[in-house]
């Protein structure tokens, strides 16, 4: 009798294992979709397209990038949260969508912990602090001195209230005990244009946006908000080198799915993301934007997300930054 039970148990286990392997082998059997909550042409969008191209090659299925823009990333993120948890809908996510907005909005239509499954962190980018050409400073230290001499008068553009450029400015003010006039714009292009025309004094931006403007003499790059000097602007000293110890600011780029996808499907996605993060096309794309490849698996990304939420949640609460 005991032998019969053992045989039946073994047979049942074998069937389950074969079923799981079959599901793993069959996925994907139709096109996949990557939701991007930002407009076409930006860092998130172009990064998602590189990921999509590589996934399509590896999976042998088309991968469509769908831009669902609006509400500082909330529209696209809500759409991703409500998608079927079958592994066919992914979202390319950033600090705004998954670490800032949850603390910024009183009424948010998604919950990061409840609605999403981290798959992988792929890359991180850091800001440089750029200033208009006519501003009488040449480095971060001189900017801090000028700001302390005239509290609240020097203007700094951001991509919008609660954007990574905004919270980086707020963090910079806290660390340096300074006060600037924050001028939020509706996106990257208007903020950079305001800097270029002299409408604002400075802005935290990604280096690839302003490196050409620096070379033409239209802006100055005062410092790199990174732990080490950036490859795109190797002559620009870090904030740490200029006395603002350990200061970093920027964004990051990862991939999530709706929570509840089958474990074998998640495992296959995670495996492919690890390969993409090390692929020449992805690394070349990252290098061209001054973005650092920083792969972390699902567990590592989940831990990173928790720390990012703690960091930005505390700052947003202390500063009373909110959007109704």
Predicted feature locations:
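N-terminal signal peptide c-region/cleavage motif recognized by signal peptidases
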Residues: 18-22
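An extracytoplasmic/periplasmic, membrane-proximal ligand-sensing/linker region
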Residues: 29-31, 178, 215, 241, ...
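Hinge/capping helix and adjacent helix->loop/strand transition within the periplasmic-binding protein
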Residues: 82-88, 103-190, 239, 252-285
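Beta->alpha turn/N-cap motifs
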Residues: 92-97, 158, 187-188, 205-210, ...
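A ligand-binding cleft/hinge motif common to bilobed small-molecule-binding domains
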Residues: 97-107, 171-175, 202-236
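C-terminal lobe and pocket-closing loops
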Residues: 210-280, 307-310
């Amino acid at each position: 009798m005991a032998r019969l039970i053992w045989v039946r148990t073994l047979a049942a286990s074998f069937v389950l294992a074969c079923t799981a392997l079959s599901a793993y082998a069959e996925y994907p059997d139709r096109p996949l979709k990557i939701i991007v909550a930002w407009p076409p042409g930006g860092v998130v969008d172009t990064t998602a397209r590189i990921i999509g191209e590589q996934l399509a090659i590896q999976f042998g299925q088309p991968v469509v990038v769908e831009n669902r823009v609006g509400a500082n990333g909330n529209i696209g993120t809500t759409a991703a949260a409500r998608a079927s948890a079958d592994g066919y809908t992914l979202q390319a996510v950033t600090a705004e969508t998954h670490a800032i907005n949850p603390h910024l909005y009183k009424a948010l239509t998604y919950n990061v912990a409840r609605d999403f499954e981290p798959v992988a962190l792929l890359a991180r980018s850091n800001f440089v602090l750029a200033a208009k050409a006519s501003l009488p400073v040449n480095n971060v230290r001189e900017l801090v001195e000028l700001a302390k001499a005239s509290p609240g008068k020097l203007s700094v553009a951001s991509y919008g209230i609660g954007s990574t450029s905004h919270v980086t400015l707020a963090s910079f003010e806290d660390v340096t005990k300074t006060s600037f006039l924050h001028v939020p714009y509706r996106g990257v292009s208007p903020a950079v244009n305001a800097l270029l025309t002299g409408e604002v004094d400075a802005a935290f931006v990604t280096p690839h946006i302003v490196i050409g403007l620096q070379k033409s003499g239209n802006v100055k790059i005062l410092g790199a908000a990174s732990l080490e000097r950036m490859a795109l602007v190797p002559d620009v000293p870090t904030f740490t080198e200029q006395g603002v110890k350990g200061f970093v600011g920027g964004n990051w780029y990862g991939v999530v799915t709706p929570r509840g996808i089958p474990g074998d499907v998640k495992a296959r996605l995670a495996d492919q993301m690890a390969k993409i993060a090390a692929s020449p096309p992805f690394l070349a794309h990252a290098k061209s934007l001054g973005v650092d490849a920083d792969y972390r698996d699902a567990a590592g990304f989940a831990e990173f997300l928790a720390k990012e939420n703690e960091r930005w949640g505390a700052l947003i609460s202390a500063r009373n930054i909110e959007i109704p």
